[in-house]
A protein has these predicted regions:
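Gly/Ala-rich beta-loop-alpha elbow adjacent to hydrolase catalytic centers
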Residues: 11, 15, 19
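Conserved alpha/beta-hydrolase catalytic His-Asp/Glu region
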Residues: 44, 50, 58-112
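Catalytic histidine-centered segment of alpha/beta-hydrolase-like enzymes
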Residues: 147-160
Length: 168
């Protein structure tokens, strides 16, 4: 035990789901939970995590390698850079978790926490039903202008500004 208290927990995309799970293990130590476009619901066909989850134990390393090459060819260089920094095992396992229908969904876990919670959108990913749904569950919604899902790449200064607003 590191004896940490008043931790500010941040997560993006699939990392948001990890942050939701971690918060469930130690909510009493968490001061606030800040998420940027996390996975709240199981990934569906057409999402990258769904595609990666379709790989098998036998071929996921070579398939992820092929996906990186495809993305690096100009299709999505940011995603290629991200995947290059992941262990293939981690990419495969979190993607498989992202498609599962959970006994307690990440969305329900996020709604249940009693700490301040924030959900940050990039304005280029809107509209979203969650823009109206999340505040009904006492979640503060913030928007980063001139950014989509990859807001830390697309507008890092804007993201910093919005995160600072969440810390006030």
């Amino acid at each position: 035990d590191l004896n940490l208290n008043k931790v500010i927990l941040f997560g993006h995309s699939l990392g948001g789901a990890i942050s939701i799970e971690l918060c469930g293990l130690c909510e009493e130590k968490i001061d606030r939970l800040i998420l940027t476009e996390p996975n709240l619901d199981p990934a569906t066909k057409g999402r990258t995590s769904w595609t990666v989850a379709q790989y098998t134990e036998e071929n996921y390393k070579s398939r992820i390698s092929s996906l990186i090459e495809y993305c690096a060819s100009g299709k999505n260089t940011m995603w290629a850079a991200t995947l290059r920094n992941w262990l293939p095992e981690a990419a495969y396992q979190i993607s498989r978790d992202a498609i599962e229908v959970r006994e307690v969904p990440w969305r329900d876990m996020f709604y249940s926490y009693k700490i301040p919670r924030f959900f940050i959108f990039g304005n280029k990913t809107l509209p979203s039903d969650d823009l109206e749904e999340l505040p009904k569950n006492n979640i503060k919604v913030k928007i980063v202008e001139n950014a989509g899902h990859s807001m830390a790449w697309e507008n890092p200064e804007g993201l910093v500004q919005v995160i600072c607003e969440c810390l006030k």
